[in-house]
Amino acid sequence: MFVSPPPATARNQVLGKRKSKRHDENPKNVQPNADTEMTNSVPSIGFNSNLPHNNQEINTPNHYNLSSNSGNVRSNNNFVTTPPEYADRARIEIIKRLLPTAGTKPMEVNSNTAENANIQHINTPDSQSFVSDHSSSYESSIFSQPSTALTDITTGSSLIDTKTPKFVTEVTLEDALPKTFYDMYSPEVLMSDPANILYNGRPKFTKRELLDWDLNDIRSLLIVEQLRPEWGSQLPTVVTSGINLPQFRLQLLPLSSSDEFIIATLVNSDLYIEANLDRNFKLTSAKYTVASARKRHEEMTGSKEPIMRLSKPEWRNIIENYLLNVAVEAQCRYDFKQKRSEYKRWKLLNSNLKRPDMPPPSLIPHGFKIHDCTNSGSLLKKALMKNLQLKNYKNDAKTLGAGTQKNVVNKVSLTSEERAAIWFQCQTQVYQRLGLDWKPDGMS
């Protein structure tokens, strides 16, 4: 890199001071030469002073003579070489400005000669003015912006951090649920009858009067076909604010999935997890749902695919059919438990029911009629009834004294026929209430 040489006047001043200092430190007290005396005789002039043109011409010969004596100027009178101290100073300044991080480490200053070290400690007004002006010239150059270079580096790193995507790891239930549902159902379903569309844009058959339907319908909507861009490559956690609210979680079920993956996703979902349905039933229901969906898909496409490429309505239909199956099963089992308990109480009550004691038929005279009764006959009837009641009372007292509590039935059991009849009744009532054409089956 080429550094512009300083003006000749300033150079004469600095070198003049330098030679004066050497002369003072010379133990032999050597007399200065004529050039040095002429340089010292020139008054100190600042670099920023406005010099006339003739002054520059007067100082020029002195400058040439001094340079020729010191051996620092070439034979060409129109070219002035830069003193080594200024080159070192400029080099150090450039290193400091281009390498701001070097401030944490000790800067290695090039001090090859004691001469350079002495020059660095010059504190005369002339040298200070020159250094000030010289450094000001650097402030206007491209190297006078060390903060800019540092800012560019830090800004670049911050841009890298900003461009690094930060994916969402937690979402609220409202954000996790879909906002629209028009793509989940075929146009025929949505446009057939506007009266069959709910306020949220879903068909009426998505609202069922079943046990915990709304809760599990929300869970079914958390089964998604693809990841959102803000989620990255991982499903976020669904956060709920309520203490007593159940936990929700997202599940991924792509549109192009194998039958086994669809079945496993449905069985391992949280749909009606509170009902504690056995895994065999859920597995059977999922297999039946997927098999029915595959049959309809092959009828529509006319081809058999190892992996079904489902449309969004077909995909949603599989989830809702499985949800309906497990919901009906949970409702029937809940109703069965209720009716079974009611039937057991009724059966227990009838088992412990004590029937009133009636007089034996032989004690009542044959052909006895009330309107034929005389006073004596009425008295005889009263006497017979009184004796019978007294006898029964004594027998009851003896029985209670002997501990008739052993004969009281505290627990009853139902036969398989009774259980099958109750289950059949529960299924029939649920199917009729929902408008399903399903046929009741045996106890599963």
Curated annotation (Swiss-Prot):
Q: Name one Pfam family in it.
A: STD1
| GO cellular component terms given for this protein | nucleus; plasma membrane
Locate the transmembrane regions by residue number. none
Q: Name one GO biological process term.
A: regulation of transcription by RNA polymerase II
> Transport as a keyword?
no
User: In what ranges is there compositional bias, type Polar residues?
Assistant: 28-64
> What UniProt keywords apply to this chain's record, in alphabetical order?
Activator, Amyloid, Cell membrane, Membrane, Nucleus, Prion, Transcription, Transcription regulation
Subcellular location, record wording:
Cell membrane; Nucleus
As for membrane topology, the entry says: Peripheral membrane protein
Instruction: State whether keyword Electron transport applies.
Output: no
Q: What is its main location?
A: membrane
UniProt subunit comment: Interacts with SNF1 kinase; via catalytic domain. Interacts with the glucose sensors SNF3 and RGT2.
What this chain does, per the entry, is described as: Involved in modulation of glucose-regulated gene expression. Together with MTH1, represses the hexose transporter (HXT) genes in conditions of low glucose. Stimulates the SNF1 kinase by an interaction with the catalytic domain that antagonizes autoinhibition and promotes an active conformation of the kinase.
Q: What else is known?
A: The prion state [GAR+] is provoked by the interaction of the two proteins STD1 and PMA1. It involves a complex between a small fraction of the cellular complement of PMA1, and STD1, a much lower-abundance protein, and it is transmissible by non-Mendelian, cytoplasmic inheritance. [GAR+] makes cells resistant to the glucose-associated repression of alternative carbon sources. In contrast to other prion forms, [GAR+] cannot be cured by GdnHCl or by inactivation of the molecular chaperone HSP104. Present with 238 molecules/cell in log phase SD medium.
Q: Which family does it belong to?
A: To yeast MTH1.
Q: What is this protein called?
A: Protein STD1
| Gene assigned in the entry | STD1
